[in-house]
Amino acid sequence: MSANTPFMTAEALLQHWQGHRRLTRRVIDAFPDDQLFSFSIGGMRTFGALALEILAMTVPTVRGVVSDEWIPLLDHTQRPKHELLAQWDASTADLDRLWPQIPSQRFAETVTAFGQYTNVVYKLIAYAIDNEIHHRGQGYVYLRALGIEPPPFHIRA
């Protein structure tokens, strides 16, 4: 590999992210319906609220990268688990549809997301992925506290 050869392609980054999203979906699905938006520990947010935050970041961020229109997803209303999973699946399809529209040079450009977060595009995307991983970890703790074995973290298929 030469110094000018990227170690990861945009497609590889998308597949990495989608692997995390598949795992997070399994964590959402592991929650009992009545605990998704009610169970928390130590005053922290419920996993349902965290999942809605992940949804609010994922597609709006990528859509903003593509179009430079930064429209936040503001609906944080509690919903039944089956509706949350349907929204998750729709956002996965949106991500797959939008991602190829990002020109390769765009990843190195500096943008201001949502009128307040100025950073390089690949760092904004990395933050969205990191935020999902962080919140999923909280979901793992909640599931264990509920006596439920969470999905194996290393299986992302």
Each predicted region: which residue ranges?
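Basic/polar N-terminal segments that are highly enriched at the extreme N-terminus
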Residues: 1-11
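Short, contiguous alpha-helical
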Residues: 2, 14-29, 33-76, 113-157
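Acidic catalytic patch
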Residues: 100-115
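Helix-adjacent hinge/juxtasegments
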Residues: 63-102
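Soluble or luminal CAZymes and related metallo-dependent hydrolases
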Residues: 9, 16-20, 87-90
